[in-house]
Amino acid sequence: MWSNLLPVVQKGDRLVATTIAITSEVFKFSGQVHLDTYALDVERVSIDLDRYDDVAVNSLRLSLEAIRKRTTEFAFWQRTSKLGRPAYEERALLVAFLVQQLLGLTFRETEGILSLFRSYYGIDRVPDHSTLSRKLSSKRWTTVLERFFQHIVDELPKRSAIVATDATGYSGRKRGWRETKHAQRASEDWVKVHAAIEVDEFVVLSYSLTDSNVHDSREFSNVWDRLPSNVTPKRSLADSAYHGENCLAAARRHGAVPLHGIKKNARHFARPETNYQKMASFWRHWPNRAAALYAKRAHAETVFSMIGALLGHRLKCRSSNGRKNEVRVKLALFNLVQLAMRKEFWC
């Protein structure tokens, strides 16, 4: 295969570099290799520029329309009273929270921009900035935002999925989660998100919010117990933080085959008994096959990066509950934006 490469010419004691011509045949391979197991053919790589232009031009418009569509269909179950000052419509508040995250606005800027969108979203009264800040920190909106997230994922079709589980953090700090040293994360005021990601669709299926000092593995069962009923997990992907027997057993209970990271000193077991021994034996006996199946675990980190790029990793609220509710808005809006780019969402 390497016969097509031009050698380096040696003149006396000097090495003279020549042009190395690597043909495309070098990149055509199949079977199990160290890099990956996908066949790579650079001559067939193509980009649909027309579709890319359509998505780039209409992404914001489709996102705003998706907010209007889903908030109209969602049942708020808001209680009303004939006494006292009339309460703001909760649909208007939810629209405000979603638009604020989508456009990266402050509460005051959100109040101003909603005045332009009053007729588009059918809002009678625009909430002021102090109301938005106070409502987002309330326990009532914790329930509403969790129900709204569930409303979005419940609308997806029934399917089997490969689920990757990972954790990230959000705070008001300028330095992001990935830029923060691991030892500092547990002592700082981060909102830690433990999420289950559908790796093929880049959609957040379920999540759990904790303080930053909670270990990833402790929330694995809670996250998987919250998976929507229309998703049947067939494989569980996670890093070595989730190699414990409780995590593996939780994935098995939901019908998924766990393929998590293992310890560096793990060995092959001739007669494996526990879930971890079975998984470690698979890693040691078929390392290339395990690595190929495990490769999509990185999609969970890709989703976290997409959320940070689209909505930012910094939080505006100062109260503990308000910060968590702000993260709930980010996760629900990210799913909404992802689904709005698909034709099936509008059918």
Language model regions located:
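Short, basic interhelical loop/turn and adjoining N-cap
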Residues: 116-131
